[in-house]
Amino acid sequence: TADAKIGLEKLSSALGGHTYAGPDAGVKASWFAKADAVTAAPADSNSLPTDMQVIGAVQRASRDNTVVMCAAGTMPGELHQLWKSKLPLSYHMEYGFSCMGYEIAGGLGIKMAEPERDVIVMVGDGSYMMMNSELATAVGMGVKITVVITDNRGYGCINRLQMGTGGAQFNNLYAHSNVSPIAIDF
């Protein structure tokens, strides 16, 4: 720990004569090329897309004024790495507490605050199941948002965290889920 002023002075001293030369366009271009590769459409049209490929499809279909919104699960981490914001204030993530269920309500609020912008909510099936009721609010108010639901059989992110920390799988995947995909246009 350090006093802010003292800490900055020590960091400045440690840097010596090194200065920031500005952004490196080559690094950005290299990253975008890698991102484009993993977000490209699946080569096999009969296979299910990865979350990364879903992000790519949404990105390609979005307009410059689009705001993407997400809150919980694995999707914020993927969007953080792969989404290419086209305008300022077009990337809305709730990182702090991974609030499952905030996505649709948050998207509704964004659209109400900026009605001229397109709002795309990216949500996992677990968060969607926790709180999808704000869709009825959006319809009742005539507020158009787009909701993209990704499916990892329930709470796949929680399952991976549980298993990765030495826990046993417990009631967080829908192993026998064979329901049809949701296609709703209000």
Predicted regions: what is each one?
Residues 1-12, 77-78, 82-186:
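Thiamine diphosphate
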Residues 2-5, 9, 21-32, 45-56, ...:
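Electropositive phosphate-/nucleotide-binding environments in soluble metabolic enzymes
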Residues 13-21:
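A charged, well-structured terminal subsegment
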Residues 16, 63, 114:
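Short conserved AdoMet
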Residues 29-106, 110:
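Active-site diphosphate/adenylate-binding microenvironment
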